[in-house]
Every structure is written in structure tokens, then in C-alpha cells.
Amino acid sequence: MIFFLLEGEREIITEICGSIIESNEKDIFKTLDKAVDLDVNYIELRLDVIENITSKKATSIIEKIRNVTDIPIILTNRTKYEGGYFPSTEEDRIKILMDNASLVEYTDIELSTNENLRQEVIDNANRTIISYHNFEKTPSSEYLENVVNSALNVGDIAKIAVKPLNIEDTYVLLRLLMEYDDLIGISMDKLGSYTRILGPILGSPVTYTAITDESAPGQFDVKTTRDILKKLKNY
């Protein structure tokens, strides 16, 4: 059982983020309309899946989104190494983020990014999510604590998403959420899917949800997430 981790009553303060993962503008705005209807708190715009993405194209899309809604944006341009699809060079990937970071509320940049390139993005961003993804395993608590500390030393929020190989791995993630504020923690796949609900109870500031198709293994859709959180504590 996992509920030994819960100590007293905890207020659920998490925000629901709907991920937009579409390859073309037509589908981006179809999904955006759904996100608006679902009243998400944030939208994550995944630049790495957009065909022929450039800085100029990213700027245009962001400006068009602003004409539709004032929902805060989390801008992501995920590297292939951490589960993304950006097809070009690391310098191009960073330039697109750097050129557009000031236009959005949050910019997601991987902790593994070259330190100088990462800092260029941070310097241009309003606020940052420093992320770490491991699709092979859940590292030790000590290792992940170092990851979180490193991320929070340079950014506003830390995000870790790891693959559990057994149920005990999911407890590692939950314990981290108990220890840290400003940590988004996700244990992936069906085995870890329950952490997407317990995470908000333990203080995770954002929970990522699917507007249409899931963007990560084990991810719930917006309606399911909100319904469960409401039942748990009048969310």
C-alpha cells in the first residue's frame, strides 16, 4: 500500500495542462479549441512535432493562439534523446526556444542540455521548467534528488518523468513529491499512471493531460483527470 506516504490533509492546488501535439496548424487549432472548451489551466505547445518548424513559424503560431485564448502556454521543443521528435540540430532546437521563450509563460528546457545553451534559453524566458526524462528506468532516490536539486538551482520548476520497472519504483517518485515543492513528478506507463493523480495530492504544481491522444505513456485525458480530482477533494 502507498498511503503511508500521506501525512494529514493536503490541499490540491495543481493546475491541469493539456498537451497540444499536432504536426500542422489546422490540427493545432482544432485541438486548441477543445482545450478551451475543456477549460484547462495551461496548454503545452509541443514545437518538436510541428512539420518544418522554424522560429518564425513558432512565433506565428503563438501569436495566433493568443488571438484565440489567454490560457498560459508551456513551450516545449523536446529533444529525441528525451522522447521528443525535433529533427534538426541542437543549435536549431535551442534557437527556436530562445527566440520564443519571452512570448510564453513557461519554457521547458531539458536539464541535459548543454549548460551554455540551456542558460541562453533561461535568460530569455519568463519562467522555466527544467525537465528530466528517463524512458528506460527509475534511477535511485539519491540520483533523482540530485536531478531535482540541479533543476531547481537554475529554473523555477523541476519536472521528472521516469519509467517504473516495478511498483516500488513508483514509490521513489512519490517520496520525491513529498520532499520538494515546485516539482512535477511523473511515473510513466500503466504501472505508474496512478501517480498522475496522487502527484497533485502530494503537491505537484502541474499535471499533464491529453486533449486528444496521450502524449506520454499512462497519461489520462483532461476530463478523466478533472473528474477524479474533483471526487478526491472538490477540485
From Swiss-Prot:
Functional summary from the UniProt entry: Involved in the third step of the chorismate pathway, which leads to the biosynthesis of aromatic amino acids. Catalyzes the cis-dehydration of 3-dehydroquinate (DHQ) and introduces the first double bond of the aromatic ring to yield 3-dehydroshikimate.
Active site, per annotation: H133, K159
Native source species: Methanosphaera stadtmanae (strain ATCC 43021 / DSM 3091 / JCM 11832 / MCB-3)
Pfam families attached to this UniProt entry: DHquinase_I (PF01487)
NCBIfam families: aroD
Highest taxon above the source species: Archaea
Presence of the UniProt keyword Amino-acid biosynthesis in the record: yes
This protein's UniProt keywords: Amino-acid biosynthesis, Aromatic amino acid biosynthesis, Lyase, Schiff base
EC number, UniProt record: 4.2.1.10
Molecular-function annotations in GO: 3-dehydroquinate dehydratase activity
PANTHER family attached to this UniProt entry: 3-DEHYDROQUINATE DEHYDRATASE
Catalysed reactions listed for this entry: 3-dehydroquinate = 3-dehydroshikimate + H2O
Annotated residues for binding of 3-dehydroquinate: E44, L45, R46, R78, R196, S215, Q219
CDD domains: DHQase_I
Assembly behavior: Homodimer.
Pathways involved: Metabolic intermediate biosynthesis; chorismate biosynthesis; chorismate from D-erythrose 4-phosphate and phosphoenolpyruvate: step 3/7
Family affiliation: Belongs to the type-I 3-dehydroquinase family.
Name of the molecule in the record: 3-dehydroquinate dehydratase
InterPro entries found in the cross-reference section: Aldolase_TIM, DHquinase_I, Type-I_3-dehydroquinase
GO biological process: 3,4-dihydroxybenzoate biosynthetic process; amino acid biosynthetic process; aromatic amino acid family biosynthetic process; chorismate biosynthetic process
